[in-house]
UniProtKB/Swiss-Prot annotation:
Membrane-traversing stretches: none
The keyword Coiled coil is annotated on this UniProt entry: no
Full protein name: Dihydroxy-acid dehydratase 2
Organism the protein comes from: Pseudoalteromonas translucida (strain TAC 125)
EC top class, as a word: lyase
Entry EC number(s): 4.2.1.9
Catalytic residues (UniProt): 472 (proton acceptor)
Key words of the record: 2Fe-2S, Amino-acid biosynthesis, Branched-chain amino acid biosynthesis, Iron, Iron-sulfur, Lyase, Magnesium, Metal-binding
Role of this protein: Functions in the biosynthesis of branched-chain amino acids. Catalyzes the dehydration of (2R,3R)-2,3-dihydroxy-3-methylpentanoate (2,3-dihydroxy-3-methylvalerate) into 2-oxo-3-methylpentanoate (2-oxo-3-methylvalerate) and of (2R)-2,3-dihydroxy-3-methylbutanoate (2,3-dihydroxyisovalerate) into 2-oxo-3-methylbutanoate (2-oxoisovalerate), the penultimate precursor to L-isoleucine and L-valine, respectively.
Similarity comment text for this entry: Belongs to the IlvD/Edd family.
InterPro entries reported for this sequence: DHAD_IlvD/Edd, Dihydro-acid_dehy_C, DihydroxyA_deHydtase, DiOHA_6PGluconate_deHydtase_CS, ILV_EDD_C, ILV_EDD_N, IlvD/EDD_N
PROSITE patterns membership: ILVD_EDD_1 (PS00886), ILVD_EDD_2 (PS00887)
Subunit structure: Homodimer.
Length: 559
């Protein structure tokens, strides 16, 4: 490389006699004289042995490094963190899950800005890795690529992690013996990779590919595969082109690119968490994405992927028929994607998809547009007097489109879960789990344990659940989350009392607490904000700085 442009940042760290101490330290980690003349590419690895989602990412980081080095740049691998949702679910530890998104983002910014990396490649596996990495890349706004760690293979008898959660409910209901629960526990997770359905990790990886920030089909590869290794090498080579042409996240992560991502995740039947995270990712790059965008795009976008949790197939089975590239080609040909959006290949979306073959005849995973699972979005944005600033539900229609029931109110996830397991929740109830929002939790925990218990008890079509917390991508049933304003801020969800009638109407997109305005005002006047649950440490700091879920639950908004 002769141009100084690809060394915009690293030259300040390593050039000139005054930087001899910097070069001396870098020589100790393997730099030679020629390396100081190359672009430096930080490789942000989320490797960790705390979860199978990330246990293999160290080897993927090495493959990325090979690609970077072979293309004439210098790779520098460093680590950031991960928190496993699946392991911490239903415990106090889950309060750190969404917080970890900010820690990942902040740490990528800190390391690559502090060390003068000219470009960055981030590799993620577990749910919060994806938005955390993208937010960090967007903040830095240096040539960047995201690499997905890949999906896990199915467990025995087509099981996955959600099978284990739902088996807990089935055991509590007396439908299966303890030996069957133990067998499912021991055979559902066969090795490395992210949770296998169209849960949060696979949803967000797909969204990032549609954004143009990962290589074609990066989101649809098994974690342990030659294709995933090649994806890493290809990303390492591609970053050099981005450096030479100064193509940055702000050139790729445009409003139209986010519209592409929203369109794709709706067709896939993706996780409600995508709403929160896409808003946050857009905010990091200075693009405004709101709940209204999900409504606008959702009105004209069908759900056509028969994938878990609402469907029957796993991501590994979608991979076998071609991944998401053929779906994106179908969407492009139907005029539903913006083909002129730039991507990390240096080509437009349309150019990347030009030669993609369609799915094989006879496959039943991706349905035709004229025979959708649902004719419009399953991600239903609700308003009404219970959620005047918005709430997010995932309703495919299998649960019905309207639910009216009487409230059973719980001020924590633990209380709600115990009540469900103990049989206190019955058909016709609306379970209200509150004070679990970004500030009130703090940390906006996912309610996979309660929703799985409801399904395992056989109440999936007879009980609704609403919360100011979140839902796992594996949650299913008549569920509404992200209720704003949250209870801790005095939102209407804080005013619900046991026995109140609540109506959730997906067609009118309203969630209504069926009491008079006068009664609502009276309850509001009596309400008092509870004391914060934490006064020091990470969760306390997070609660003081985090924004509303309707604006992405970000922590760096100007005060």
């Amino acid at each position: 490389m002769t141009s100084e442009k690809p060394r915009k940042y690293s030259q300040k760290i390593v050039d000139g006699s005054a930087q001899a101490p910097s070069r001396s330290m870098l020589r100790a980690v393997g730099f030679n004289d020629d390396d100081f003349k190359k672009s430096q590419v930080g490789i942000a690895s989320t490797w960790s042995m705390v979860t199978p989602c990330n246990m293999h990412i160290n080897t993927l980081a090495e493959e990325v490094g090979k690609g970077v080095d072979s293309a004439g740049a210098k790779s520098v691998i460093y680590n950031t963190i991960t928190v496993s949702d699946g392991i911490s679910m239903g415990t106090e530890g889950m309060k750190y899950s969404l917080v970890s998104r900010e820690v990942i983002c902040d740490s990528i910014e800190a390391v690559s800005a502090g060390m003068g990396h000219d470009g960055i490649i981030a590799i993620g596996g577990c749910d919060k890795n994806m938005p955390g990495c993208l937010m960090g890349l967007a903040r830095l706004n240096r040539p960047s690529i995201f690499v997905y760690g890949g999906t896990i293979l199915p467990g025995e008898n087509h099981t996955d992690i959600v099978s284990v959660f739902e088996a807990v409910g089935s055991y509590a209901a007396g439908d299966i013996p303890i030996t069957q629960l133990e067998h499912i526990e021991k055979t559902a997770i066969p090795g490395a990779g992210s949770c296998g359905g169209m849960y949060t990790a696979n949803t967000l990886a797909s969204a990032i590919e549609a954004l143009g920030m990962s290589m074609p089909n990066s989101s649809a590869q098994n974690a342990i595969s030659q294709n995933k290794k090649q994806d890493c090498i290809d990303a390492g080579k591609a970053i050099v082109y981005l450096l030479e042409h100064d193509i940055k996240p702000s050139d790729i992560m445009t409003k139209k690119a986010f519209e592409n991502a929203i369109t794709l995740i709706i067709t896939l039947g993706g996780s409600t968490n995508a709403v929160l995270h896409l808003i946050a990712m857009a905010d990091a790059v200075g693009v405004e994405v709101t709940l209204d965008d999900f409504v606008r795009i959702g009105d004209k976008t069908p759900v056509i992927a028969d994938l878990r949790p609402s469907g029957q197939y796993l991501m590994s089975e979608l991979i076998e028929i071609g991944g998401i590239q053929p779906l994106m080609k179908r969407l492009l040909d139907a005029g539903m994607l913006h083909g002129d959006c730039m991507t990390v290949t240096g080509k437009t979306m349309a150019e990347n998809l030009a030669d993609v073959a369609d799915y094989p005849a006879g496959q039943n995973i991706i349905l035709p547009f004229d025979k959708p699972i649902k004719k419009d979005s399953h991600l239903v944005i609700l308003a009404g007097n219970l959620a005047p600033e918005g709430a997010v539900s995932k309703i495919t229609g299998k649960e019905g489109l309207r639910f009216t029931g009487n409230a059973k109110v719980y001020d924590s996830e633990e209380q709600g879960f115990a009540a469900i397991i103990d049989g206190q929740v019955v058909a016709g109830d609306v379970v209200v789990i509150r004070y679990e929002g970004p500030k009130g939790g703090p940390g906006m925990r996912e309610m996979l344990s309660p929703t799985s218990a409801i399904m395992g008890k056989g109440l999936g079509n007879d009980v609704a659940l609403i919360t100011d917390g979140r839902f796992s991508g594996g949650s299913r049933g008549f569920v509404v989350g992200h209720v704003t304003p949250e209870a801790y801020e005095g939102g209407a969800i804080a005013l619900v009392e046991n026995g109140d009638s609540i109506t959730i109407d997906a067609q009118s997109r309203e969630m209504t607490l069926n009491i008079t305005d006068e009664e609502m005002a009276s309850r509001k006047q009596r309400w008092q904000q509870p004391a914060p649950k934490y006064t020091r440490g990470l969760l306390a700091k997070y609660a003081r700085t985090v924004s509303s879920a309707s604006t992405g639950a970000v922590t760096d908004k100007p005060s």
